[in-house]
Amino acid sequence: MNPVYSPGSSGVPYANAKGIGYPAGFPVGYAAAPAYSPNMYPGANPTFQTGYTPGTPYKVSCSPTSGAVPPYSSSPNPYQTAVYPVRSAYPQQSPYAQQGTYYTQPLYAAPPHVIHHTTVVQPNGMPATVYPAPIPPPRGSGVTMGMVAGTTMAMSAGTLLTAHSPTPVAPHPVTVPTYRAPGTPTYSYVPPQW
């Protein structure tokens, strides 16, 4: 037992041997400890009852106001599905995607190995780009170039073949360079190709 520390027995008022300025042997101006109250706050509060009666097991009702069990819900999520938009991998099934003229592209995120090995900033946080629906190219009339619509090849071939041809052009003079004779070159150093 430490001789310096000798706790006083219970119920004995504090002697205050060193004269510390406690007025009546108890700090904070109390002559004795305040009486115990089961309520944390003074006064009656209908929401917080005074306490549990001795002998009752500790159990809190699911609905403190009425005591009734809340109604059963088959969904584990207390929020409805359509309250907040969720970006899905299939944007056409989302009620917030534009259904008609424009398709929505899902959010793009590069795979982790691409982000890890490159210094290019990946557009991970960019919103989905909206691009117009593809328009098919216009269908041609099925008529070959040089033919008149409504005719067959046999009808138009005679006109095409007997048409006047321009005057033929004389052949152009071509100069062929003189090449080095085969054999060992006169120089031995070949510069690199890069």
Curated annotation (Swiss-Prot):
Those parts of the protein on the Cytoplasmic side are 1-18, 164-194
Name of a matching Pfam family: TCRP1
Task: Specify the glycosylation sites in chain numbering.
Answer: N45
Predominant place of localization: cytoplasm
A single GO BP term for this record reads:
neurogenesis
Provide the induction entry. Up-regulated by different neurotrophins, including NGF and BDNF, but not by growth factors, such as EGF.
* UniProt topological domain (Extracellular) ranges: 42-141
How is the protein altered post-translationally, as described in the entry? N-glycosylated.
Q: Which family does it belong to?
A: Belongs to the FAM168 family.
- Provide the protein name: Myelin-associated neurite-outgrowth inhibitor
Q: Which organism is it from?
A: Mus musculus (Mouse)
Q: From which lineage does this chain's organism come?
A: Eukaryota, Metazoa, Chordata, Craniata, Vertebrata
Q: Which gene is the coding source of this polypeptide chain?
A: Fam168b
